[in-house]
């Protein structure tokens, strides 16, 4: 597990779920970013365009690190697509190996998404990233899943459930990476609670100190897998 920095709580929010004004919604096609997430940080990001017209709330929220859920409509040719043969085989093996966290028995089929969308935990930065001296506000999403290939141009939807911390500058790259790694752990712990996990779909979260859990909670996240809603970015 990542080292816990001073004055950093391990969890965000009440166990019952996100509090107003959350959750926020954001969607778009994944675009190329600054190219440093994987190369310098070892933390790949999937960027979305920042559009004040589509997401009017984004200009008024603090710059910083947020967390929540991401859904991706990956093409069948992508190794992580819900319809790819590799993903289907992996899902079948996982379902046969152990019971689901929602009480399902061994061998029960898990519903990872719908309408081609799969749902994953995520942590994201909205802001200017002072360490890199950005002059344009960006939305950089780190989906908490190890993907077998890139997915530029794919539709991604975000349900932003809460705020972790404000952005800040760092004296060096190691300090930045340490904070990001702890952000990821905070997101995983927070999202693994019943009030924060999606209802209607099963999601996998690699909870620090506990391992991978398959969860189904009570948070309404139907928008993440609803068809034909690209461009919706409101509350």
UniProtKB/Swiss-Prot annotation:
It holds the Pfam family Flavokinase. Its EC number is 2.7.1.26. Pathway: Cofactor biosynthesis; FMN biosynthesis; FMN from riboflavin (ATP route): step 1/1. Keywords: ATP-binding, Flavoprotein, FMN, Kinase, Magnesium, Metal-binding, Nucleotide-binding, Transferase, Zinc. SUPFAM superfamilies: Riboflavin kinase-like (SSF82114). It catalyses: riboflavin + ATP = FMN + ADP + H(+). The keyword Flavoprotein applies. GO terms for biological process: FMN biosynthetic process; riboflavin biosynthetic process. Its cofactor is Zn(2+); Mg(2+). Belongs to the flavokinase family. Catalyzes the phosphorylation of riboflavin (vitamin B2) to form flavin mononucleotide (FMN) coenzyme. This is Riboflavin kinase. It comes from Chaetomium globosum (strain ATCC 6205 / CBS 148.51 / DSM 1962 / NBRC 6347 / NRRL 1970) (Soil fungus). The lineage of its organism: Eukaryota, Fungi, Dikarya, Ascomycota, Pezizomycotina.
